[in-house]
Amino acid sequence: KVCKGTEYVIPTFGCQLAANSEGRPEMVGTKWLEPKLDGARVLLVVSDDNTATCYSRNGKVFDNFPHVEQQVLSNVYAIRTYLRIKGGFVLDGEIMGKSFQDLMRQAQRKENVQTQDTVFNVFDILPLEDFKRGFWNAQLRKRLDVLSDMQPVFDAMPNVTRVDSQIVVDLSTEEGRTKLHEYATEMVTAGFEGIMIKDMEAPYECKRNTFWMKWKPTITVDLPVIELEEGTGRNKGRLGALVCRGVDHGKEISVNVGSGFSDTERDLFWKQQEVIVGRTAEILCDVITQNQDGTYSLRFPRFVRWRDDK
């Protein structure tokens, strides 16, 4: 992107992103399955002159993981040897903490930072030069071979590891499709967010496409509405969110639900607040999360419908 009136160029930051797997014709052939981690996506960039920086997938600098950066720098020459390059490289992965909420708080803190126990889970690698171009034509299977060969390096880094628990399936066969569903169930039961489905023959490309696909379960929760919040911006003067609180899945859940409504519903519900309060809403979410105070909330809650039978 070029800023007019100046002589410098603003770099565009990107990385490989996954498409949703539902209904995709690409869900055939040989695929690599791995757990979808519930952490912060991190691109650890090592420059040609041996400086390491952690970036978010949007290019925001993460300053709070120096222990990870230092461990990688301590093994920089070994990593270059396995990758067969002399310059910079990028480790693509996910930083994990004790919980997603705690990790996000620590990642953004300016002081009293406590990230020393976080672990960087690496699932891809590529030369920095190719990352800057937005494309590396090395097949996924070859990139994974590099990571596998690097196991002695990972063993030397207490807070940097390689994503484990992967399998290969052929989704063109009934056996492969059955294995995918069994694996997805196993990973979710183990506490992972879902699974990643990757094309073994695909290159690394810095954009969203079906080279990588993701599958996540959804959960429905039924909670009573205790009050309504007015919206802001274009939703000022009508419903912004339903404030819901109650017990479901054996947990005390409190959450504000601000999506899933049509404009007509926002207007109608706001005008009928006395009728809405006390009704039970069916809410779709990705996962039930625990707050620091021991209560629970929902990740990405969306209103589905009213459950007047409850």
Language model: regions and residue ranges:
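Intrinsically disordered, low-complexity regulatory tails
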Residues: 1, 103-120, 125-126, 250-310
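Charged, flexible boundary elements
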Residues: 1-29, 33
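Amphipathic alpha-helical
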Residues: 164-219
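Structural detector for short beta-strands of small beta-barrel domains
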Residues: 218-234
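Short aromatic-glycine-enriched beta-strand elements
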Residues: 232-243
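Short, acidic/hydrophobic/Gly-rich beta-strand patch recurrent on exposed beta strands
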Residues: 241-246, 256-258
